[in-house]
Amino acid sequence: VASMLYLDYGKKEGEWLPNKFGGNKNLEAIEFFHHLNSVIRGTYPGFVTIAEESTAWPNVTSDIGGEGLGFSFKWNMGWMHDFCEYMKLDPLYRKGNHYAMTFAMSYNDSENYILPLSHDEVVHLKCSMVNKMPGYTADKYANLRVGYTYMFGHSGKKLLFMGQDFGQEREWSEERELDWYLLGEKLNQGVHTYVKELLELYRKYPAMYEIDNTWDGFEWMNADDAEHSTYCFVRKCSSSKNNLLFVLNMTPMKWEN
């Protein structure tokens, strides 16, 4: 989306012309998105449109009009970057980057977000999700499980690219299928079962999805325990008796109290 919204996107000085107001906004692209989203919503109720927008363009998911583009959801690219950078750190050194995992909540209410772990993160020598994780093989899978738990607890809808649900170990390539034989391996079976159980929890408890992208559905209990690399938060729903408490330890250490 960003490459359409900006006239100067990826271009050097002299390679683009400003709009009639002298700016770099592509007014025709904005009008196209207005028309696209209004037609889809009006013709096919229940359909969603999702924007991969990598800049700070505002109101991508706001109602159509002005700068509101009218998309249903926007990929939270910042969350994806921060999550991957944090999770690939050795757990004993994560405390130095503790707030990478809390930063996305500071702008969580600005859009209707999806938390994506997309194909972009598992190509071009970036490694598969499991091989981004530090440690020996078993440690990698343990880190992946706790990372997914954080993802499912965090505000925003979820997107896992194919193979991430069972710990695909090779990078993705459009030239071959996934390594399905891994479903016969114990560690991969464990991740597959774990993701299945996370999805079952997600369906069962409205607190995990009912109030996304506002502070009414999320409350930090402790976002500042960098020394122990722990996070504690509550996901809320309209029925407060069904709120969920998440406590995550991002190290292999045992902490008391």
Report residues per predicted region.
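Catalytic cores of secreted or luminal carbohydrate-active enzymes
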Residues: 186-211
